[in-house]
Amino acid sequence: MASLLTALILPLALLLLDAAKVLGSLSFRMSPTQKETRLGEKVELQCELLQSGMATGCSWLRHIPGDDPRPTFLMYLSAQRVKLAEGLDPRHISGAKVSGTKFQLTLSSFLQEDQGYYFCSVVSNSILYFSNFVPVFLPAKPATTPAMRPSSAAPTSAPQTRSVSPRSEVCRTSAGSAVDTSRLDFACNIYIWAPLVGTCGVLLLSLVITGICYRRNRRRVCKCPRPVVRQGGKPNLSEKYV
């Protein structure tokens, strides 16, 4: 009868869960409030009713994080009996009424699938009360980072202030030393000729652009033939160009 009653009130419990959290926090004391355990460890959770005469029995439930928001009924505890949900192994999960207002749930050997949020609920005067959630989980796995492979090269003691090209070192002479002209080959000449060639190229391009613009803007002279009027009043056809 108790399991049937619990199955009927579970849908209603989901709708009233948020509203009952305030009442539940004032009506229950959970011990511990959270639990971080390990595989194979024994886990004991206690639910204490703070209001005397609130109820004679208590139901334990578990909510597993995931897509399904419905909690899972685990057991119903009273002074007379312990009613486990179908499919649960009594050697793995058990419960008992410790005192008049304390109800205990015990997991003999914690498993991976036992992780979740545990809570208890009671019905008193047609009111459904829920306790706070007790998270029971395994320790979080630390994020593994790949180990850095040690470098085979020995670290340099003196840091370099700036990078200098080896070609520029060939063309540079130290202060007070004689200049060795035999070493000034093409590697040094390119530092001299490259800016000069670039400058000449820019000047030549500017000259070409200036010439093109001048030819386009030059004033056109009309070369149309016209007769020349002589003093006699008639044009001379032999002299028709000016």
UniProtKB/Swiss-Prot annotation:
The residue spans the entry assigns to the Extracellular side of the membrane are as follows 26-189
Topology relative to the membrane, per the entry? Single-pass type I membrane protein
Q: Where are the transmembrane segments?
A: 190-214
Cellular localisation:
Cell membrane
Q: Which residues form the Ig-like V-type domain?
A: 26-140
Listed PROSITE patterns = IG_LIKE
Summarize what the UniProt record says about post-translational modification.
Answer: Palmitoylated, but association with CD8B seems to be more important for the enrichment of CD8A in lipid rafts.
For this entry, list what GO says about its biological process.
Answer: cell surface receptor signaling pathway; cytotoxic T cell differentiation; T cell mediated immunity
| Alphabetic keyword roster | Adaptive immunity, Cell membrane, Disulfide bond, Glycoprotein, Immunity, Immunoglobulin domain, Lipoprotein, Membrane, Palmitate, Signal, Transmembrane, Transmembrane helix
Q: Which SMART domains match?
A: IG (SM00409), IGv (SM00406)
User: What role does it play?
Assistant: Integral membrane glycoprotein that plays an essential role in the immune response and serves multiple functions in responses against both external and internal offenses. In T-cells, functions primarily as a coreceptor for MHC class I molecule:peptide complex. The antigens presented by class I peptides are derived from cytosolic proteins while class II derived from extracellular proteins. Interacts simultaneously with the T-cell receptor (TCR) and the MHC class I proteins presented by antigen presenting cells (APCs). In turn, recruits the Src kinase LCK to the vicinity of the TCR-CD3 complex.
What is the designated name of this protein? T-cell surface glycoprotein CD8 alpha chain
What organism does the record attribute this protein to?
A: Bos taurus
